Each structure stands twice: as C-alpha cells, then as structure tokens.
Design a protein with these regions (language model features):
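Outer-envelope beta-barrel architecture signal
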Residues: 36-42, 81-85, 138, 152-156, ...
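Flexible, surface-exposed loop regions and adjacent strand-edge segments
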Residues: 58-63, 102-111, 173-182, 231-240
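Predominantly the C-terminal beta-signal and adjacent terminal strand-loop region
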Residues: 195-200, 205-267
Length: 267
C-alpha cells in the first residue's frame, strides 16, 4: 500500500511539473506572437480521453478501457479563408486498456518486473491472466481544419485528417490472476516506442474576444502500429510431451483507439 501511494505521489508530481512546463511554453509563445501581428494562433488543451485496445487474436480479448488525459500546446496556422493547418505538442496520459489472455504464457519476457517468476519459463502467467496496459506518450499531432462562417460568436469546424506521431515515454502494467494482483509493473521493454495515429474530429469554436476562442470538440483516433513487441509466447498444456507445454510465438497485433473530448483555448 505504501509503495503504491508513493508511486501515485511521484506520478502526480511529474504530471504537475509537465503541466507547468507546457503552460510556461504557451505563455512565452503567446507573448512573442502578440508582436508579430498574430500570423498564427496558439493555445492550450486539456482533453479527457476514453481509451481502449483491441487485438486480432481471438484468444486475447479486450476486457476494459482506460480514462486518460491529453495535455499540451496547440497552434492554428491560416491557410485559406475557411481553413487552416493545425500543429501541437501533447503529453498523453493513461492511454491503453486491459486484455484477458484466454491462453497463458510468457507475455512479458523483457520487462523489468518486481517478481522474476512472472517471466520465467514457458508459462509463468496462467490461463485467464489479465494485463492492463497504461501508456504515456509524447505526441506531435498535425491536421487540416475546415471552418464554417461565424454565426454569432460560434464557428463550427471539421478537422480531418489528423496525423499524430507518438513516442512512448512510460509503460506500466497491472497483472491480475486468480491468485495475485501485481500493480504498476514496468513493462516498457515489451512495448513499441513509436506509433502513428490517424484520426478526425469536429466541434465548435466560441469567440470570447477578437483574439481569444474556446474550443470544444469530439475526436477519434486509431493507432496504426502494434504497440506490443511480440517477443513472448503462449503455452498450451499438453501432458503427452516433454516439456509439458506446447508453445507458440506471440504474433498478435494490438492497437489503441481513443475517443477524445477536446477542450482548449486559442489566443
């Protein structure tokens, strides 16, 4: 309990530090651009994320999602009268979800786990093991935004496509069986660092003044790259052979999908 509390406290401190860094960056850029005739606009987003994962292997079943947060700087670069390019720099926290592995095996052979027995042998993880993936990314999204004419103070928009380059900064996993639960295990070495997300979204910009606008929208993005290394194996019990497990290399494809409630402000 004490260990988990300390881990949560450290994570909160890191999160607060990153929020402050992003805030300072946005304010510095805004101050600089105020003297440049606002060639482009910048802002800040803090957007809740409903994240889930899926797998092309029928024996690896999605078993719940995660509630996360995207936090970072956004920019709007005019292109034509009713369209613009967008560019950002985000931290994405707690993306991922949970898989139920109907067939156990050694799925985390390279991770820095607290108990070596969790990655020793052909089948350290039993049938029905659940692994919750908690992923933190540094993201660089770029998109093309189309706007309607302003009606009152509101302007509606469609942003598509949105292509996001993502780099894994942190990977944690909760391992759950009938006999034990291991939380916040370091599983980054069994995960793929780069990813690419393809998405789109729509929403509304509400002008509070000539230069300041609130933004609210709904976005969806899908990861195009398998986020697991696939260095592990599944193991089916077979008492007629020695050793008593029939192993198969894990070649499944696991991807992330995010539904994002985009909340931001442009200056």
């Amino acid at each position: 309990m004490v260990k988990n509390s300390l881990s949560i406290f450290k994570l909160m401190k890191r999160t607060i530090a990153k929020i402050l860094c992003v805030g300072v960056l946005v304010m510095t850029l805004q101050s600089y651009l105020s003297g440049q005739n606002n060639v482009f606009r910048i802002g800040f987003q803090a957007s809740p994320v409903f994240s889930g994962i899926r797998n092309n292997n029928d024996l690896i079943v999605k078993n719940g999602g995660s509630l996360g947060l995207k936090l970072g700087a956004i920019s709007d670069i005019p292109w034509k009268e009713h369209s613009s390019f967008t560019l950002g720099l985000n931290f994405a926290f707690h993306e991922g979800g949970q898989f139920l592995y109907e067939v156990g095996g050694n799925y985390l052979p390279n991770s820095d786990l607290s108990d070596p027995l969790l990655q020793t042998g052909d089948k350290p993880l039993p049938d029905g093991v659940k692994i919750r993936y908690q992923l933190q990314y540094l993201e660089i999204p770029a998109g093309l935004k189309f706007r309607t004419n302003e009606k009152g103070n509101a302007t509606y928009f469609l942003e598509a496509p949105v292509i996001t380059l993502a780099f894994l900064m942190r990977g944690r996993g909760d391992i759950e069986t009938e006999d034990y639960i291991k939380e916040q295990e370091n599983i980054k070495k069994d995960l793929v660092v780069p990813n690419i997300f393809l998405g789109l979204g729509a929403g509304v910009e509400y002008a509070m003044s000539q230069n300041n606008s609130l933004i609210a929208g709904l976005y969806f993005q899908r990861g195009l790259i398998d986020f697991t290394q696939d260095h592990g194996n599944s193991a089916v019990h077979n008492p007629d052979i020695i050793p008593t497990y029939l192993t198969e290399q894990d070649d499944s494809r696991a991807t992330i999908g995010n539904l994002i409630l985009f909340l931001g402000i442009l200056f």
